[in-house]
UniProtKB/Swiss-Prot annotation:
HAMAP family: Trp_synth_beta (MF_00133)
Catalysed reactions listed for this entry: (1S,2R)-1-C-(indol-3-yl)glycerol 3-phosphate + L-serine = D-glyceraldehyde 3-phosphate + L-tryptophan + H2O
EC number: 4.2.1.20
Keywords: Amino-acid biosynthesis, Aromatic amino acid biosynthesis, Lyase, Pyridoxal phosphate, Tryptophan biosynthesis
Name of this protein: Tryptophan synthase beta chain
Protein family: Belongs to the TrpB family.
The keyword Lyase is annotated on this UniProt entry: yes
Listed GO CC annotations: cytoplasm
N6-(pyridoxal phosphate)lysine sites (modified residues): 86
Gene it is expressed from: trpB
Pathway: Amino-acid biosynthesis; L-tryptophan biosynthesis; L-tryptophan from chorismate: step 5/5
GO MF: tryptophan synthase activity
Broadest EC class assigned to this enzyme: lyase
């Protein structure tokens, strides 16, 4: 029986109740078979093209870095059906679930983007869908909650713990433990127990593959750096995967620094956490001196996650990728700038990556460089949040 690597260096693994091991083994075997099955790959490719709208554009910005010698491109995952990169891997996993004969899908969601993507895939492929969502997130992401319901999903608010994403993850795993024979747990990021980090990466890697081809066509060379925001890390690993062996391309992940790293109110476990076991994996984790999980914080619900995917931890450990952070205010400034200068409303998550790219462009305006930001999602879901913050600041 062929097996995938369960670890990335020391990170990853499969720390789950014994009852779930057969379900994870089945998932791994079916994934390996599906990857070797031309008809599965063809169906996935067709859904991505005909339904989701791939390939997405690689847009050269016109105005935002005008006074520098930086060329800044945006990989437009915001243009994907569903509004974010999430749709890619959800279609892949939903097809995999059908292949395994599962009729129900369980998912968790933070910002609601993964929930919406799961709901649309389930509607399309005729699967029953239930989504766990922290009660706090249900409040702050009401448009996405309604979208999920419109597409036939059952949305279950989670009131335990901090009533955010980590609690929704725990409830979803609990449900799966009870129902794995008929339900597939459609995990929303490149984290969690093996084989999820690998499956999600492979179902997102077209982001980097397309970027590479588009870049060569437009500029005749690869970029100096690709930059992506990191919560759990799926959009970033999708962008990085095809560039890992291209040693001249810097991989830069941007974690949320929230109100500032020094305040403790952030979501940057890669640089400021300690290794622990959470959500079925060994990974960097925000924890206090007693080893209890600390609350993560970010202006963007989708980055508000106290851990990170194991491959990112490994890429940092071997110095292949670099991880920076951007504060709420920096992300907000980048958000406003992209709206005003380019006519694109980005997700607050993606705005963290953009903020770091702008920092690179402006700290040395005379440096010639070619940068790509993965614009992982559109900002429609965030306009009410931004409106309230700007109102509070007296800017509108």
């Amino acid at each position: 029986m062929s097996k995938l690597n369960a670890y990335f260096g020391e990170y990853g693994g499969q720390f789950v109740p014994q009852i779930l091991v057969p379900a994870l083994d089945q998932l791994e075997q079916e994934f390996i078979k599906a990857q070797a099955d031309e008809s599965f790959k063809q169906e996935f490719k067709e859904l991505l093209q005909e339904y989701a709208g791939r390939p997405t554009a690689l847009t050269k910005t016109r105005n935002i870095v005008k006074n520098t010698r930086t060329k800044l491109y945006l990989k437009r995952e915001d243009l994907l059906h569903g509004g974010a990169h999430k749709t890619n891997q959800v279609l892949g996993q939903a097809l995999l679930a059908k292949r395994m004969g599962k009729k129900e899908i369980i998912a968790e969601t933070g910002a609601g983007q993964h929930g919406v993507a799961t709901a649309l895939a389930c509607a399309l492929l005729d699967l029953k869908c239930r989504v766990y969502m922290g009660a706090k997130d249900v409040e702050r992401q009401s448009p996405n909650v309604f979208r999920m319901k419109l597409m036939g999903a059952e949305v279950i608010p989670v009131h335990s713990g901090s009533a955010t994403l980590k609690d929704a993850c725990n409830e979803a795993l609990r449900d799966w433990s009870a129902n794995y024979s008929k339900a597939h747990y459609l995990l929303g990021t490149a984290a969690g127990p093996h084989p999820f980090p690998t499956i999600v990466r492979e179902f997102q890697r077209m982001i980097g593959e397309e970027t590479k081809q588009q870049m060569l066509a437009k500029e005749g060379r690869l970029p100096d750096a690709v930059i992506a925001c990191v919560g759990g890390g799926s959009n970033a690993i999708g962008m990085f995967a095809d560039f890992i062996d291209e040693k001249n391309v810097k991989l830069i992940g941007v974690e949320p620094a929230g109100k500032g790293i020094e305040t403790g109110e952030h979501g940057a476990p890669l640089k400021h956490g300690k290794t622990g076991i959470f959500f079925g994996m060994k990974a960097p984790l925000m924890q206090n001196s007693d080893g209890q999980i600390e609350e993560s914080y970010s202006i963007s619900a989708g980055l508000d996650f106290p851990s990170v995917g194991p491959q990112h931890a490994h890429l940092l450990a071997i110095c292949r990728a670099k991880y920076a952070s951007a504060t709420d205010d920096e992300a907000l400034d980048a958000f406003k700038l992209l709206c005003k200068k380019e006519g694109i409303i980005p997700a607050l998550e993606s705005s963290h990556a953009l903020a770091h790219a702008l920092k690179l462009a402006y700290e040395d305006p005379n440096k010639e460089q070619l940068l790509v930001v993965n614009l992982s999602g559109r900002g429609d879901k965030d306009i009410f949040t931004v409106h309230d913050i700007l109102k509070e600041k007296g800017e509108i």
